[in-house]
């Protein structure tokens, strides 16, 4: 191997090493991006789990509050189920074909402020 071939071999090796360094730098940048995205997703996942737990804890409270009607509202519900209006507008009138009445439902299930 003469000096020129040796010099050319070193030049080729230098180019290959530079290409390897460039690939390594790109891989490092890509890996950093993936790790950052993964960390963001882990945090978002934790927040979503916490939010789910909060919602699940609220559901039984809402269900319990809607199922506990006072005695008078239970009586109104019974009349309504038998086909009569219990709202102020049509109180005591029969509901045609058992259609729903928004006013009656508000009287029975609506939330009222207590003074």
From Swiss-Prot:
Q: Is Metal-binding there in the keyword field?
A: yes
Main localisation:
cytoplasm
Cofactor dependence is on: Zn(2+)
- How many and how are cofactors bound here? Binds 1 zinc ion per subunit.
Cell compartment(s), UniProt: Cytoplasm, Nucleoid
Q: Gene Ontology cellular component?
A: nucleoid
**GO terms under biological process:** DNA replication
Name the domain of life.
Answer: Bacteria
* Residues that hold Zn(2+) according to the record: 85, 87, 101, 104
The UniProt keyword set, sorted, is:
Cytoplasm, DNA replication, DNA replication inhibitor, Metal-binding, Zinc
Kindly give the Pfam families that the UniProt entry links to this protein: YabA (PF06156)
What role is this protein assigned? Involved in control of chromosome replication initiation. Inhibits the cooperative binding of DnaA to the oriC region, thus negatively regulating initiation of chromosome replication. Inhibits the ability of DnaA-ATP to form a helix on DNA; does not disassemble preformed DnaA-DNA helices. Decreases the residence time of DnaA on the chromosome at its binding sites (oriC, replication forks and promoter-binding sites). Tethers DnaA to the replication machinery via the DNA polymerase beta sliding clamp subunit (dnaN).
Family stated for the protein in its record = Belongs to the YabA family.
Q: How does it assemble?
A: Homotetramer. Interacts with both DnaA and DnaN, acting as a bridge between these two proteins.
The molecule here is called: Replication initiation control protein YabA
Protein source organism: Lactiplantibacillus plantarum (strain ATCC BAA-793 / NCIMB 8826 / WCFS1) (Lactobacillus plantarum)
Which lineage?
Answer: Bacteria, Bacillati, Bacillota, Bacilli, Lactobacillales
